[in-house]
Amino acid sequence: MSNCKTIAICNQKGGVGKTTTTVNLGVGLAMQGKKVLLIDADTQGDLTTCLGWQDTDSLGITLATKLTDVINETMNGPMVGVLHHEEDVDLVPANLELSAMEFNLVNTISRETALRNYLSEMNGKYDYVLIDCMPSLDMVTINALSAADSVIIPVQAQYLPAKGMTQLVQTISRVKKRINPNLKIDGMIPTLVDSRTNVAKSTVEALRENFGNQIKMYRTY
């Protein structure tokens, strides 16, 4: 995985466009000829259903399966159960089974690095791995941050998420200090932007004013 870039799409607030950002970025990279793996790290399985697998409960192998295999040291091959989408991206799906991983990870030695250990088995199969994180800062999300080279933060441009952003940046800093010294923030992506409204304009401006000296803001409008 040395030439592969792993990006966590992360924000602990729901409804900010994480899944849409993950899909659009992944498909865009695939259109450029890159080999892309998407990882659904959300118990709701929104990325999985968005890509067409509606009955997530029927999936025999999911991210929970892969993490459990890492914990139990029973890996049967990293590509087993990986799904392929017609847009030429691969997917490690998720369903509600992932919710049990919080307890399982807390009680294992490699609790912060199980996902990193799984990805290390890929042996350079992909150019990019994009992780769609759940809207919380739980152990699965910590695993995503521990496995990532960088973080992209989608931010809904309809309110000022100052407190949530501060908490997220602090969590990323702690992971960088304690577990993943190479982790960095690529930038913020304003989502749901209606540039005709004063609310959107003022929110984007406030984000730029409060965090612009720390975090790059991508222009999406």
Language model feature labels by segment:
Residues M1-Y221:
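P-loop NTP-binding core
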